[in-house]
Every structure is written in structure tokens, then in C-alpha cells.
Amino acid sequence: MRLHRAKVSKSVFTLSTLTASCLMAFNSYAAVDCSALAEWQSDTIYTGGDQVQYNGSAYQANYWTQNNDPEQFSGDYAQWKLLDACTTDGGDDNQAPNATLTSPSASDVLTTGDVVTLAASASDNDGTIARVDFLVDGVVVAQASSAPYSATWTAVAGTHQISAIAYDDKALASTASQVSVSVTDSTQPGNEAPTVDITLSASQVDVGDVVTLTANAADADGSVDKVDFYVAGSLVGTVASTPYTLDYTTTRSGRWLCLRARLITSARQRIRPRRRLTVAAGPWSVPVVLMVCIKPKGQCAVLYGVREDGREKMGADHPRRVIGYFTSWRAGDDDQTAYLVKDIPWEQLTHINYAFVSIGSDGKVNVGDVNDANNAAVGKEWDGVEIDPTLGFKGHFGALATYKQKYGVKTLISIGGWAETGGHFDNDGNRVADGGFYTMTTNADGSINQQGIETFADSAVEMMRKYRFDGLDIDLRISNIDGGTGNPDDTAFSESRRAYLMNSYHELMRVLREKLDVASAQDGVHYMLTIAAPSSAYLLRGMETMAVTQYLDYVNIMSYDLHGAWNDHVGHNAALYDTGKDSELAQWNVYGTAQYGGIGYLNTDWAFHYFRGSMPAGRINIGVPYYTRGWQGVTGGDNGLWGARLAKSKRVSNRYGEGEKNNCGYGATGLDNMWHDVNAAGDEMGAGSNPMWHAKNLEHGIWGSYLAVYGLDPTTAPLVGTYARNYDSVAIAPWLWNAEKKVFLSTEDKQSIDVKADYVIDKEIGGIMFWELAGDYNCYVLDANGQRTSIDSTEQACESGQGEYHMGNTMTKAIYDKFKAATPYGNTVATGAVPSETVDIAVSIGGFKVGDQNYPINPKVTFTNNTGVDIPGGTAFQFDIPVSAPDNAKDQSGGGLSVIASGHTRADNIGGLDGTMHRVAFSLPAWKTLPAGDTYELDMVYYLPISGPANYSVNINGVDYAFKFEQPDLPLADLSSGNGGGTGGGDTGGGTTEPGDVVEWVPGSTQVSDGTTVTYNGKCFVAQNSPGVWESPTQTNWFWEEVTCP
């Protein structure tokens, strides 16, 4: 972690009486006697508590540090803490400043909820005032860095000590100036509480309809001054006399818009009952997913499958999700290859995704000829598979609709997939490359295909309703601004549209969410929208900040296929953690490049933290594979792991695209590739792809009775050598190694599943998704004829040669058993306290570059001031970014953006990332006000992908405010009184910001120190790393950082 004296806003917390007294006792400070302190040495290791002197000041180490200059790396969360200036003779010529608290006074009459002005005068005879701290009961509640020194505090009942302490430019503190004030409880005995309730003329309306809000307000021992009406945290009207009635015209949609009345009486009491109103979606709205209806007396309504706490209802034994993909193509009549709806372990699942539905040539969802009696989706029937005859359709859809009613499991249609993102299969099984998602969402000129999206979305919702599904799962592979990341067969459609695909993807998801919410309101159910998302940083870098998460119920991370035969790096298919040994990352010097912070990004833990930047943990599900990936002819490595196998030709197939332009690997074939794809010529594509039940048979040396059906026989594909199981206890990943054949198969089994399930529980993650149900295994006892009979849960029959593995539910049951008694999943994005009020500041993120130009990642974050008042220069903003990126985020706009609280400080992420979020901060230039209605553009830079950011706040006049768009149900602050502003601002950083301080650069002549801002050829730059007189600035590099000119 590298911090440069960034300021951190401090939240109010409760201290014990002893602690508060101790704090107040140290109300003035003397310089430190440094005679016994050693000078700081750059090559010395210091640990927490060590004290040193440096450049006339005393510092104390906060934690382990080496080669971190105490002057540059001091602060609340940095390596060093500044103690004070040094004195070696017991004296100090610096005089303490003076502070006088001018407000409040002891005679003030204060009531709970009053906004109290804190004000002080301050002076320093031999220097300047750096800041004034305001304290309540010994706790700093606000700071002011310029005169007039003032802030506000919301009064709470009781007697409180209010104090002001001034600090001079040498960090010497004044004696505390303090006063004791009493705050009366507005509901104290002798003052009867007022009453108020809200009634609505309608509980469900359309956008544009008028709703009459009526407040029945009374005060038995006083009078009602007024009633304020709020909708979604915004004041919409005030009524000062009876009847307290307001006609409100709905302007936004959403389930459960919060309606609130604030009653203010002559005794200044305030009570705030709430009601909720459902407003059906309008053509432009962005509904909010999974909101909770809070009624008076704390009761909550339950609707659309949402619990009182906002979490999804899934049954008493399902606090976390267990989601399985059911594939359409295992629909034959042979028990050796078929996997039907009756085979699903229904009791152990919460959701089933049907894979796949495609996009037909007409732009609508497609499952083939629905009038064909052999259509697996809607026409076919199977012995032993129950289908309700009253449904009006058969096939997998009929069976899923029948069984889910018995078990309370939700079903979703998965649309897309690798082969059907850019095309579909016709009735003869031939792939038709007609553009699929690419042409449906994006026109040839890059514009959004609005009509195509409307047509598709309408057909998807219609299919969902007709066939009794609970939602849509979009499996788009892959809408991306990076090149070579999708199916190479789709290149003709994808490459020309690449720069525009994310815009179209956002619009597609927005329209789907809107149409699903309209259908939900009409049908009285909650229809879900989810996606299958990639997991590697290379792919996610091309998906900007994954802004589509705002429209989703949850995201399923495909945290598998992290290594495979698309390149020659022999590694784990689905590692949970990085080990610091990933050969692909090592080849690209990810571990050794400082900007990456040593973070390995080909693992589940990294992918989870990426999505955690924009979503609660409970709206994220990690993925696990019930299949293998593998190579043949592997050389080197630890039993093959991190070895290599280059393909016989540079391109043995085009199955996986260009990726990072690694060499193609030599994928395992034959017996080691039972679940293989074929290319256009019908040839087997080597990938080492097998269901886990076949891998378990290989592990135990069993020739499966099913192999002949898959075209394998012992004469042409003999069982050679031993498939020894290995386990990486750091990555949490098993694999099989056949030393004789040099075959490596990356696997998943119960041991790794158990650890991953524990990880989900510990991290408060929503659950686990797996591909696919038919890949799970059981051990079956074989009878005298070699037929599978009963299940042996001990697996002894398979270990002794008396059984074989086949399709089952061992891993699924392990997940269910772990989850059934788990705590509820996490349901908040924020990891800390949220401010109690909001301001209306909008945020948009854009300007991402295309392809390899998108490094470092450098978007423009635009803040729009919708507060109605000017925001003064120097105002400090903060927000969170996930620890998927290292703690070296910065900006190129002079805002001094830096990480002020790091969630992960280690030089690697071996065994997992430590925290959840980094807190970053920047300030408006001190000389530049942000006018009402205007924007500020933050030119942000970071080095690994993030989703979000999230948890925005702004500090105005010493008070932290959340942003309205993130916290719509919190009250909106009133900044119109002129109390707004700027006193809570932090370091502007990034060099000088006053126009007069900018130095004109003259090559060969100008000599500057680090931090100086210069102008050259019409651009401005901040010096760093001591540039010489001939190091003329032309772009951001080792010596210069380009910034916006003041």
C-alpha cells in the first residue's frame, strides 16, 4: 500500500467514558523529544510501534515497512504515523495556536434532530492554522481547513461536550475550547408524541398517473406546523394546514417506491411513517431489482419471491443458491448417454438453467420446429419422464414445468452459448452463421439495432411465459471491446462491431429488465434476469466496468476454462486461488510487473472480487466445472502441472479464438477426450474434455461399460498407464497425471467442491453454479452381468473393481449439504457505514479505449452536480473499487486520486485476496467551483479490471453524504441554506492547481522538483522521479504525468 498523506473522513462512533476522558485529557500537545530516536534508514526493516526521526519530525511505524519515506508515506492508513516535530533539548520555539468555540453556547435550547452549527475562531502567533477539529464527547465529527471554521452536527438526546481544537502548520494543537450542551429528547415524558399515518388513493399505478397522498396528522398537546411528503428520498411537496393532502404525479417506475411523510410539530418533534407504491415501468425507466416494502411498525410485505430482508426466497434448506445447467442435447433413449429431467437431483437445487435457446434468422428466440413431435424442447416424450398433459406442450420444457412445481425449483432459459452467440443450428443440425446476438443488437454502422432488440426481447418474454419459466439467462460469448475474444466463426460479425458492442449489450439488458418487470407486475410473479459472465481479467478488461449488473438479479461467473488446450500452458481449469506459479501469467510477466501489484487473475477468488465491486456478495454465484480440460504429450512441470505442450501446428483448431495470442496447446484426444466437439470437417477437436464420472473411472483404472456408445473400444483406444490423482492445496484444484502417456487432466471432485462451498459461505456469496448436471458422478455397484445397480456412496465398489462411475449427484449433494445450514448471503454493496443523507450527484463512466489500447485502463468518470447549488473547489469525493485491481489507482486530471484505505496490501494474492474494497479519494481543484448543473471529469487510471465503482460519498461542510442514485430511500439533504461546502476537502494532489503556479517548460533550461506542474506544447504535466532539463514532457511516462491544465 502506498499512500501520500491522504485525508480520510472519520465517522462518528461511540466511545466508553474512560476512552473519551483520555482523549479529552490530551487537549494540547508538545513536541517530541527525539534525542533517543534513531534516524530513519531506507534499508532498515521497521515493524508496528517502531519510532524514528526524520527531517526534524518523529514518526511511528503502523506496520511492517521498508524503504518507505516517512514524509511521503504517513497517514492513518499508511506505513508511518506522524507523532510531532522533534526537540532534543526539552523546549520548542513553536507556539501553540489558539482556538475559541463560538457556537453552540451553553444556553442554547436543543432538541433531538436539530442541525447544530459548530463554529470556532482560531489564530496562530507564529504561523498559520492548518485546520480546526470539532469534537463531540471526544470524537472528531468534522474538520474545517479554512476560515470561517464551521461545520454541522445533528443533535442526539443527552448531555454532550462540544470542543474545538486548532492545529498550526507544524501540527501543534491548541488547548481545547469546549462547552457542555443539553439536548432534549423530543419524545420525553410530559410531551405526548404526535401521530401520523399515510393513505394512498391507489397502491399500483402507471408512470404519469396521479396518486393522492393523505397524511392523517395530529398532536394532542401541541400543534402541527407542517407535513413534508417524500418519494424515494426526494421532497415532492409540503402542506402546512389541514387537510394534509398532496396530489403526486408519478415520474419514475419501480416496485416499491418509498413514500414518506415527515410531521413537524410546534415542539419540533419529527416522525416519519412510510408507505410503498408500485409504479409500472415506463418506456425509459430503469427498475430497481429486489427492493423491500417497509410498512409502518416495521412490517414488510412479501411479493415476487423476495423476503423481508431483500433476499431471494428459496426454501428453508436453501439459504444459498445451487444452480445447475441442464443441456438439451442429451435427449436420446440410451441410458448410457441420456440425461433427462427425471435424473435431476431436484431436492438439492434452487435453480435450473436450460441450455440452450438460440436466436433464429428472424431475430426471435429459437428452439427449432415447435410442431415436430421429436423436438427435444417442446415435442418429445420419454418413458419414465412425467409431463403434465394439461400444459399443452411436451419435451424438456413440459417436463421441467411439471417437476419444478413439485420441488419449488426455479427454471430459466439460457440464450446463447459458445456455438450460438453468433448463429444457430437449423432443423438438420447444421450451424447457420447469421450473426445472432451481434446483428440483433448492433447495426453494421455500429449503431444500436433498437428494433432488433425489441423484437428479440418480446419473443424471449413470450417464450418464458408460454413455457412456464421463471426468467432469462443471457449467455453471450462474448460482447467485448477487446479483439479475438469470441468464437472465431463469428469474426465476420463481431470484429467490425467490436467498438460498439458494449453499448448495444447495455441496451439489450436494459430493455430485457424493463420488459420482465412489466410482465412481473402483470402476472404477480418476479421474473428473473441473469447472465453467465467470464472470469479472467483479459476478457473482463474488454467489458468496461460491467455496468449491466444494475439490471440483474444475480450473475453466474464462469470461473472455469481458465486454462485449456487453446494455449500450451498446462494448468488448472478452475483454480480457487492463485499460487504465484501460473506459467501463463509468468510468461506475460504479470507477477513481475509493478503496476499489477503481483496479483494473479486466473482464479475464482479474483473473479468474485471483481464483481464484488458493483454487487452485494449475495448477487454473485461462482462457477464450478463438472468436466475436465487436458493436454497430451506434456513436458516439464510438477506431474505435468505448469508444464507445456505445444500443438503440432500453431493452430490445431479455431475453437477458442486468439486470446492473448499464446501458442495453441496439444489437447488430449480419444479415451482422454470423450465429450469432444468436432470441427467443420467432422474431426475430433483435442481438448481433454470429459464428464467427471469418466475421469473418476480413469483415475481408478476402470474401463467404463458406456465407452462403446461413445465410439471407443479397447483395441483402438486402450487404457494405458495409471491416472494418478494429484491435489494443489493452495489453488484448491485436483488433477490426473498419466506419466506413461504424458496426459494431464484438470478435474473437480468432492474434496475441492467442499472447500469451494466453504469459501462461498465464508464470503457471504450467493451460491454456486455448475456446468453441467450430466457431468456429476456417483459410484454404482455392478451386478454379475456388468450392469449398474445401486449407488455406493462410500465408493468402495469402484475402488475395489466391483463398480463403475456414471452420471450422479455426488458433488451437487456435497454443495447442498454444506449450504443447507449456512447463514444468509450478503445483501449490501457497502462494507462500512453509509451516510444518513444523500445528495443528487450523477455518475457516468465511459471513454474506454478499444483492444490493446485499453491499457492502462483509463476511463473518464463524469460527476454531474444535480444538487441545485454550487459545490466549492477543494470538495473531497470518495468511492470504493474492488481489490481485483491493485491499490495504485490514480488520475490524470489533477484531482489527486489515490487509495486512502487499501483492502489488499500484500505483494501477491497467493491463497486469496485479503479484503473486499479499496477506498479512493480525490478533490476538486481548490480554485474551481463545480456549478449546479455542471460536470467534473475525472480521468482515472487503474491497471486490472474492476466493476463498479460503488459507495460514492462527498464531504460538504464536514458532513459526508451518499449519492442519491445509490441510496434512493435515504432522505435528500437540503444544501440550499448555504451550509454546503468544501471544508472537508482533502489533498488535491497531482501537483499545483493554481493557474499562476504552472511553470512554462523550456528544454535544456527548466529545472523542476517532483510535484511541479509545467506546461509544454499546449499540455500540462506533473513532474515525478526528478526529470532532467532535457526530459521534455510529451506524454505520461516515468518522468511525467499528463494532467488537465488549470
Swiss-Prot record:
Optimum temperature is 35-37 degrees Celsius. Its main location: periplasm. Its EC number is 3.2.1.202. Pfam families: Big_7 (PF17957), CBM_5_12 (PF02839), ChiC (PF06483), Glyco_hydro_18 (PF00704). GO terms for molecular function: carbohydrate binding; chitin binding; hydrolase activity, hydrolyzing O-glycosyl compounds. It is an enzyme of class 3 (hydrolase). This is Chitodextrinase. Residues 1-30 form the signal peptide. Belongs to the glycosyl hydrolase 18 family. CDD domains: ChiA1_BD (cd12214), ChiC_BD (cd12215), GH18_chitinase (cd06548). SMART domains: ChtBD3, Glyco_18. Residues 973-996 are annotated as: Disordered. Pathway: Glycan degradation; chitin degradation.
